[in-house]
Each structure stands twice: as C-alpha cells, then as structure tokens.
Amino acid sequence: MNRINQLFNSNKKDILSIYFCAGTPTLDGTADVIRTLEKHGVSMIEVGIPFSDPMADGIVIQNAATQALRNGMSLKLLFEQLRDIRKDVKIPLVLMGYLNPIMQFGFENFCRKCVECGIDGVIIPDLPFRDYQEHYRIIAERYNICLLYTSDAADE
C-alpha cells in the first residue's frame, strides 16, 4: 500500500496537504522546503512542476511558476533535487503538473523517475481521463504510479 493510501486509511483526524511550486522561492530549495513542511506537521505535499502556460491555475500559482522558470527550474532538475529525499522524508509526495512538460520529458521516463525518487502520486490537471485510459494507464500501472484526477479532467 502506498503512502497516500496509508495516510487516508489511518485514524488521523486532520490531514494537511500543502502545495508549493518547485524552484520557489529559490532554485535549490525544493528539498529543504519539503523537509521543513514535514517537520512542521504537514501530512502530504503536492510539489508543483512549473510550466509557462498554467491555464488551470490562479494568479498566485502562475506567478510562482513564472518565477521558478526564471530561476532555472526544470523537470530534470526537480528529479535531481528529489533523488535522495526519501532518506529522511516519510510523508506522501505528489507531483502536480501539466501534460506538456511531462510529454517533453517522456511519459515513461517521467514515471520511471517518479519511482526512483519515491513519488507517491501524480496530478495532471489537463490530462483527460479517456486519454489516460487509452494511452497512459498501462505505463502508469507498470510503474505503480497513482494518478489522481481532477473532476474536470475526469469528465472530459
């Protein structure tokens, strides 16, 4: 059972999930932000993958993504920063990002890197459920990646 299922099946009354955009406030601080959030009682962390056209996000996340990209954050760098995170971080980690940068990275390569870094789940808000079922499900399942869906993507 992965850490997300363990968390939601636990008897924990209050679950606090926090989102932040990788590469903010500084390029090299992503792992430190995760460690600090866990230390202060966060139950699960959603790490945003910055993208130049975050159409489903509000202005705050759009600005964070812009700053992260200006700082030099990329998916490749994010995986490098998360490579050793599981040595000391025990809470569930979820990557949240748009399909375009994931496809540029290569969907199977993305799944492989998620496993190598101990990522528990992935949210891709612009991936329609039907496309997932037809093209990506078999790859995600091969790597035991838990894809979490937004209602809009699931309804398309």
Task: Tell me what each language-model feature is.
Residues A65-I123:
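Active-site beta->alpha loop and helix N-cap motifs at the rims of alpha/beta catalytic domains
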Residues K12-L16, G41-S43, V89-P92, I119-D120, ...:
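Short, well-ordered coil/turn segments that N-cap beta-strands
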Residues Y149-E156:
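Conserved small/polar residues in nucleotide/adenosyl-binding loops
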Residues E46-M73, F129:
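Glycine-rich, proline-tolerant flexible connector loops at the mouths of alpha/beta enzymes
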Residues T30-D53, F105-G121, L127-P128, Q133:
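Alpha/beta enzyme core
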Residues S17-D28, V94-G106, L148:
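Active-site mouth loops of central-metabolism enzymes
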Residues M1-S17:
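N-terminal amphipathic alpha-helix/helix-capping segment at the start of soluble metabolic enzymes
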Residues N2, A56-G58, M73-E80, M103-F105, ...:
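Active-site-adjacent beta->alpha loops and helix N-cap segments on the catalytic face
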